[in-house]
Design a protein with these regions (language model features):
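Residue-level signal for alpha-helical context at structural boundaries
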Residues: 24, 44, 116, 145-149
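A glycine-centered beta-loop-beta connector
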Residues: 30-33, 38-55, 102, 110-125
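Short, flexible active-site loop motifs that bind/organize anionic cofactors or intermediates
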Residues: 13-16, 46-47, 88, 117
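The conserved cystathionine-beta-synthase
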Residues: 16-35, 40-41, 88-106, 113
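Short, highly charged low-complexity linear segments
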Residues: 20, 116-117, 121, 140-145
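Tandem CBS (Bateman) regulatory domains
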Residues: 1-12, 52-88, 94-103, 124-149
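Short hydrophobic/aromatic-rich motifs at helix boundaries and adjacent loops
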Residues: 25-29, 67-72, 111-116
């Protein structure tokens, strides 16, 4: 499947923010659209960058004192801001189940719980890496089959 095929299914709308936008604007956009990154544009919607949740966390970490003095929320317990209804999986969950749940739920991390105890966490990156490995193995097996047939 090509990127074009994926875009034809999901659409080509891209959430953007002008380079002069404020960090607070970006945070609002990420929240409103439930996305992990916003594309930053310049004149005539030209791509100039991308701002991700990780970029924001890195910025806060590098400027902790500035953020702490400017943001009274920084001294509040994380419990007040966390997601409380956490989707989880078990060690017996399949990769396909995980992919579907992550896609439908629009989240990138699934804690792995067995008998009420946290035993790990699976990220979308873990799933992608696994699928790429599977696809490579399948490709090699098919190639070998064709060569020996």
């Amino acid at each position: 499947m090509t990127v074009k095929a994926i875009l034809s299914r999901k659409g080509s709308t891209v959430v953007t923010l002008d380079r002069s936008g404020m960090l607070s604007d970006a945070v609002k956009i990420l929240d409103e659209h439930q996305i992990g990154a916003v594309v930053i544009t310049g004149a005539e919607q030209q791509l100039v960058g991308i701002l991700s949740e990780r970029d924001i966390v890195h910025t806060i970490a590098q400027n902790a004192r500035v953020f702490a003095s400017a943001c009274r929320l920084c001294d509040e317990p994380v419990e007040q801001f966390m997601t409380r209804k956490v989707e989880t999986c078990t060690e017996s969950s399949t990769v396909y189940e995980i992919m579907e749940r992550m896609t439908v739920g629009k989240f990138r991390h699934l804690p792995v719980v067995e008998r009420g105890r946290l035993v790990g966490i699976i990220s979308v990156g873990d799933v992608v890496k696994h699928r790429l490995g599977e696809m490579e193995s399948e490709s090699n097996a098919l190639r070998e089959y064709i060569l020996t047939a």
